[in-house]
């Protein structure tokens, strides 16, 4: 796996699923391929994106700045600086300085990532802030190692909380989660459908599913009534794709 592929993988792992994630993935691909060279426009676009947490925006801004060639005097962006200040905690800053000194001795991506993984997310963000604000310099490879270690920690905690939700025995939470998943699956089907004859069929299935979820929420239904809803939808989507000549084995 190439270095940039690895960076893209880690960064996208902390972006919530949805149309915005697809858009960010495309921007990252363009940046890494050298197709997007307007850093200012890129940062302006990032700043106004909804849904993303300030820290995620800060990390993306840091990655864009590392990758896109820019004039030396280009201003640093406040929204990135604020996100990478470790919540203003002096302890984070102290640890970030210690980590920075260790990173200065590293020359490889994996070496930097290993060193960084033993620090807290706050210290890692502060260390990125040091580098972003030009208070310290490390090689791009080492900076990417720091980025990936931070993303790994964030993704780990997201995964733990997601697992808690998925394995919860509370039937109401499970019911709501199934309805949310069915609804977002329906939305994805509508976006993928395009404008062929079979597309009308897929759109109809998706639309019915969304109406059903709406009705279930309005009248309040038994928590088990949503079981299998998303799987039924996905089966429909795969049947539609087969007719279109697209073979996607795994959506579940």
UniProtKB/Swiss-Prot annotation:
Sequence motif Nuclear localization signal, location on chain: 101-105
Species assigned in the record: Influenza A virus (strain A/Chicken/Scotland/1959 H5N1)
Broad class of the protein's primary localization: virion
Region (RNP-binding): 165-252
Subcellular location: Virion membrane; Host nucleus
Superkingdom, natural source: Viruses
Family in the record: Belongs to the influenza viruses Matrix protein M1 family.
GO molecular function: RNA binding; structural constituent of virion
Protein name, entry field: Matrix protein 1
Self-association and partners: Homodimer and homomultimer. Interacts with NEP. Binds ribonucleocapsid by both interacting with genomic RNA and NP protein. May interact with HA and NA. Cannot bind NP without genomic RNA.
Keywords of this entry: Host nucleus, Membrane, RNA-binding, Viral matrix protein, Virion
Role according to the record: Plays critical roles in virus replication, from virus entry and uncoating to assembly and budding of the virus particle. M1 binding to ribonucleocapsids (RNPs) in nucleus seems to inhibit viral transcription. Interaction of viral NEP with M1-RNP is thought to promote nuclear export of the complex, which is targeted to the virion assembly site at the apical plasma membrane in polarized epithelial cells. Interactions with NA and HA may bring M1, a non-raft-associated protein, into lipid rafts. Forms a continuous shell on the inner side of the lipid bilayer in virion, where it binds the RNP. Determines the virion's shape: spherical or filamentous. Clinical isolates of influenza are characterized by the presence of significant proportion of filamentous virions, whereas after multiple passage on eggs or cell culture, virions have only spherical morphology. Filamentous virions are thought to be important to infect neighboring cells, and spherical virions more suited to spread through aerosol between hosts organisms.
Membrane topology: Peripheral membrane protein
Gene Ontology CC annotations of this record: host cell nucleus; membrane; virion membrane
Note: Most abundant protein in virion. When expressed alone can form virus-like particles in transfected cells.
Region of interest called Membrane-binding, as start-end residue ranges on this chain: 1-164
GO BP field: viral budding from plasma membrane
